């Protein structure tokens, strides 16, 4: 039975490497996948899944108005008509940027087509608010898994994302800010509030 998965973690927890690995494993077995990512993320070009260690590949960009259920239905029907067989899996990177309707469409893909949907993304933003996509995945996903990484400052488990601009922590501003001069670091709770304190 297919399931809707949400794998979340702080910045630099290996989410993108993991999704690329899963895609490779399916394709190495001759299975067809749909690799998708947020159309908002243009750091490496729209429709590109790119890891920090330099591995990247093209993906289907998800727009705000896109109906994922209808898109996958059409893709699946086209593949069946061409004799390629149905999709084995839908993989979505940067899932925090999904809208509620996208998450519900993912659940419908799982329930009606029996195709697993694996989503990867951040849980909370730099202000420690849930992203819309993450909040709805926490509600509707069948399986939720945390991907762990360590604090940029002390090496303890990181659970938060700290935005830094000109060497100073930023706690206010737009939730989504792609391509600016800011840097984001995975941090523990203590260093989220005290980034300049050595422990």
UniProtKB/Swiss-Prot annotation:
Zn(2+) binds at residues 151, 154, 188, 191. ATP binds at residues 9-16, 93-96. GO terms for molecular function: ATP binding; thymidine kinase activity; zinc ion binding. GO terms for cellular component: cytosol. It comes from the Bacteria. It catalyses: thymidine + ATP = dTMP + ADP + H(+). Gene3D superfamilies: 3.30.60.20, P-loop containing nucleotide triphosphate hydrolases. It is an enzyme of class 2 (transferase). Keywords: ATP-binding, Cytoplasm, DNA synthesis, Kinase, Metal-binding, Nucleotide-binding, Transferase, Zinc. It is found in: Cytoplasm. GO terms for biological process: DNA biosynthetic process; thymidine metabolic process. InterPro entries: P-loop_NTPase (IPR027417), Thymidine_kinase (IPR001267), Thymidine_kinase_CS (IPR020633). Its EC number is 2.7.1.21. The active site is at 94 (proton acceptor). Its main location: cytoplasm. The keyword Metal-binding applies. Homotetramer. NCBIfam families: PRK04296.1-4 (NF003299), PRK04296.1-5 (NF003300). Belongs to the thymidine kinase family. This is Thymidine kinase. The lineage of its organism: Bacteria, Bacillati, Bacillota, Bacilli, Lactobacillales.
């Amino acid at each position: 039975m297919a399931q809707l998965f949400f794998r979340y973690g702080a910045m630099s927890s290996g989410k993108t490497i993991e999704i690329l690995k899963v895609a490779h494993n399916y394709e190495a077995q001759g299975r067809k996948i749909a690799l998708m990512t947020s159309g908002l993320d243009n750091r490496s070009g729209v429709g590109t899944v790119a890891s920090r260690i330099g591995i990247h590949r093209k993906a289907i960009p998800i727009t705000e108005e896109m109906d994922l259920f209808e898109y996958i239905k059409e893709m699946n029907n086209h593949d069946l008509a061409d004799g390629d067989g149905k999709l084995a899996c839908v993989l979505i990177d940067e899932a925090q940027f999904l809208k509620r309707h996208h998450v519900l469409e993912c659940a419908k893909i799982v329930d009606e087509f029996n195709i697993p949907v694996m989503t990867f993304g951040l849980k909370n933003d730099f202000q420690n608010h849930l992203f819309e996509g993450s909040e709805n995945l926490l509600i509707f996903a069948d399986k939720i898994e945390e991907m762990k990484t360590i604090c940029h400052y002390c090496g303890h488990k990181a659970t938060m994302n700290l935005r830094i601009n000109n060497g100073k922590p930023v706690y206010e501003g737009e939730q989504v800010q792609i391509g600016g001069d800011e840097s984001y670091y995975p941090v523990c709770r203590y260093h989220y509030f005290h980034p300049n304190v050595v422990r």
